[in-house]
Amino acid sequence: MVKSYTLAGLAAIACLLLAIGAVISTVYILNDISDFYSEAQEELVEFKDIANNIWEEMVFELTPEEMREAEDNDREKRSYEPEGPYQSETTTPSTTTSTAATTTEAAEDESGYDFVNDNGPPSSRPRKPEPPTMPRTIQGFRAPPPAATSTYRPPHGSNYDNYGREPASSRRPYPPQQPPSTSAPHSSPNNRTSLYNPQPPPKTGYPTNPRVPYNPPQPNYTRQPTYPEDNRAPYKPTRSPNTPPPRQPSGGYDSDGQTPPSSPRIYNTRRPNNHGPGYPEDQVPTAPPVPGQQRVPPTQTRNPPNPTNTRQPSRPVPPTSDGHIEATTPYNPSAQYPTGKRGSHPGFGPQRPRPGTRPRGNPCDQCSAQPNHCPSGPPGPRGRPGPPGFPGQDGPRGLRGLNGGYSGVQPSSYDPVIGCVQCPIGPPGERGPDGTPGVPGEDGIDGEQGVNGQDGQPGAPGAPGYHGMNGSPGTPGKPGLPGRNGQSCKSIPGPPGQPGVMGVPGRDGDPGTDGEHGQDGSPGIQGPPGRDGTSGPDGQPGVSAPGAPGTDGGYCPCPKRSSKFDFNDAYNDDEKRGLEEHRPRGYDSERAEEPRPRQTVRTNTYDENSGAEHQRRPNYEPSAEVAPPRQDRYEDEERVREPPPKRPPPPHRQTPHELYPEEQPYVRRPPPPQNRGNYEVERSREYVPEAPRPRQGYEHSSGYGGDDRKEQPKYMESRPVDEPRYETDAPSRSRPLKKVEIIRHPERGYDRRQPSYEDSKPRQEEPRRYETEAEPRYEEVPRKETHPPGFGRPKSEENPRETGRTYSEEAMPPVQQTEKYNGDKRKKNQPEYEDISKPEEDKERAMEKHHKKPNKFQEKQWEEHRKSQELRNSREHGGQVPVETSVPMQQVKPESSAEEKPVPPVHDNFQSSEKRAFSNENPLPSEQIPYRRRNRFYRNHYYEKFLV
């Protein structure tokens, strides 16, 4: 108990320590994660600041040469932009100059940057000062939502196309080029201040915000409705202006900005549009080509690729929501167009003006046409970054490289601009041959001393030494402590032991008193009929008077009577005339029919059916007359009528026909009468005119048999019938024939089951079990037993066949008839009697089934039993060893008798000739003991111990 408590306490402490360690480690991990997150946030903010200020640092670090190259590249890019959308036919130079004079002060921004003469890319403009609380963000770091799902209104005076990009019409227009007399803003190479403080050239009237399109005062156009100043207010499509279609490049000016392109347009090989000479992207102006340089076509085309131009891109023109490119005209933002239905949302997508519509008049146009001299207000908050732009066009092809010289020879010419050509390092050459071995080096320092090896395994134990002398006895130890008091407990009984050896059988007990008389057995098998008794004395002579003629005696001879059936003759003269008319042709009705003889089979033995006929086809004599085929039911009825028998029927005896339903007549039996004692009750039954079926054993009596047929045995004869009763009442045509009831056994009554006619294959003939003899009592044929005693028969009579006793007919055990012998398989409801119909050839099979080969346990038990029997016999003979003799053992009398005979020794192979029922290589224990112990041992020991 103490150890278990100690182990439990240690386990609890260990679990507590593990839990504390897990909590501490979790806290440390969470702290590290929080520190890492805070450092990542700081680094991200720092990265944003660096990314937002990187362009300013790059601008300050540019050299004049790099600035010139940037100007050239930017000018070439701007040459692909469309012409100014604000130069219309109604716009005059005077209006532009007047507007420029009034908006000179507004041309410059507060930061001092001139948006008019800006030649750099839009991203190179200096940013406006932002409030310190507004964080800087780089473009593209926070992508805005698409224009169709954006919650913010787009900038004033602009819209987005399907790619989330502002069209070219809403961008800052390219300002007209200045005359050549005007100096360039970046002419001085070392003047960095001129980048932000250029000389103010003649200004034109452009708005302050470069992203807001310029809207000069034009009296012929209405002004677009303005939005509130808050650019971050949510956009509502209900108050959205008429959105113009997106602008597509539709031509422009050459590099000077004033003259149309001098070089011919290329790649204009497609099908022209309906509104112009060709597609708008085919009219993109190009700069004059540089000598020795190939022109690169614009990227927004779908022209076939040029195999000679390896730098030509294949990016298609961004289509509109309609799926095709439209040829547009210069867009006037002051013109009002109705909202179209072609876009996915009202106010977005390509909107076309409806033909025949007029711009609406606005009364505020007169007020808004006045010049605005109000000072510019403070800069608004920084807007959301725009969507990322399309990738830029590829740069021009580089200059042609210098001609290289031979290996080891410098190039003949030197270009001061390019300088020396820096060639990359080539691949390593092949490995050269190995050199000669060098001088051996000096000896190294001695190493440390090694670790000692491990000890070897202990050797095998040696041989035991000599036994020494015993030592002197030690001193007695101290008495031990008294033990604990014992506890009383009840032990569980152990398992039962193995059965002991069987003891010597005890002596026979005194004979018991006779038991009660047993009940009578069931009636046995119906035996053959007995012999006829002696004839009785003759009766008194009858009245000597002539008999009166019968009903039918006046017109035809009477037919022969039948021994099976008897019908009441109830035909009148009218019926007879009908029968005469219905007779077939060629049939002599007046001629008396000769009865057809019938061949019957005479047998001297009884078959298994105990009275049934042999199923054989009847053999007719060739001279027998065959009746014509049946024509109607009347003719058949005539055939059925048979004459009465000549002699009276014998007294009624129970025949086998009354025991089996298949032996009944072919007609359905009437239901049993209410009064079972009266067996002569007649029941009217309508006769079915159908010829009776013949049986397989003998021909059915149908009117063609006579006196000359062979006489059958008495037990084969049909059931006797009463005398026919003829009705002498008035004849009636509708009165049916009546059938005489058959007298049945008074105890059995009528069998309600239908008779079964066996028309299938005939039964196999089996030998009879009894011979026909004169004695009324029969003795069973002695035969050897096929079952051990006490098995397969009632226990009340175990060996009834051994004494040769006879059985009466009433005491014979009933055996149900079976079609075929199925070995020893007994039916469920069959009584437990020995099957005496088993043939001799099944003897070996029965032996194998009931006497199997014993196992080892049985052999051991039998051997012990044999030894005990020998010991008992030796004691009875005065201790002498029994001698094996072939003398059969005599039955031992009870010890209470006066004379005692010596019992001969038991032989191992002893079997009485009268008691031997089988032969087996391994005899059972019941065969090695006297007969007086056989049944007792067999019943109590064999079945209870070995079989269970």
Swiss-Prot record:
Entry-linked InterPro entries: Col_cuticle_N (IPR002486), Collagen (IPR008160), Collagen_superfamily (IPR050149)
Extent of Basic and acidic residues compositional bias: 507-519, 563-597, 630-645, 679-698, 706-787, 794-808, 821-847, 856-878
Domain of life of the native organism: Eukaryota
Assembly and oligomerization: Collagen polypeptide chains are complexed within the cuticle by disulfide bonds and other types of covalent cross-links.
Disulfide-bonded cysteines: none
Residues annotated as signal peptide: 1-25
A GO-annotated cellular component: nucleus
Bias kind Pro residues: ranges: 376-390
Predominant subcellular localization, coarse grouping: nucleus
Statement: the UniProt record of this protein carries the keyword Amino-acid biosynthesis: no
Gene (UniProt): bli-1
Composition bias type Low complexity, residue spans: 88-105, 180-189, 293-314, 454-464
Alphabetical keyword list: Collagen, Cuticle, Disulfide bond, Nucleus, Repeat, Signal
GO biological process, one term: cuticle development involved in collagen and cuticulin-based cuticle molting cycle
Protein name (Swiss-Prot/TrEMBL): Cuticle collagen bli-1
Keyword DNA repair: no
Subcellular location, record wording: Nucleus
PANTHER family xrefs: COL_CUTICLE_N DOMAIN-CONTAINING PROTEIN-RELATED, COLLAGEN ALPHA
Region Disordered: start-end pairs: 65-934
Annotated GO MF terms: structural constituent of collagen and cuticulin-based cuticle
Disruption phenotype: RNAi-mediated knockdown causes accumulations of fluid, known as blistering, in the cuticle. Hypodermal or cuticular rupture, typically in the anterior body region. Defects in cuticle integrity.
Pfam family, one: Col_cuticle_N
PTM comment: May be processed for secretion by bli-4.
Role noted for this protein: Probable cuticular collagen-like protein. Nematode cuticles are composed largely of collagen-like proteins. The cuticle functions both as an exoskeleton and as a barrier to protect the worm from its environment. Acts downstream of the Wnt signaling pathway; perhaps in the formation of the adult cuticle. Required for proper strut formation within the unique medial layer of the adult cuticle.
SMART domains assigned: Col_cuticle_N (SM01088)
Family, as annotated: Belongs to the cuticular collagen family.
Residue span of region Triple-helical region: 377-408, 426-488, 491-552
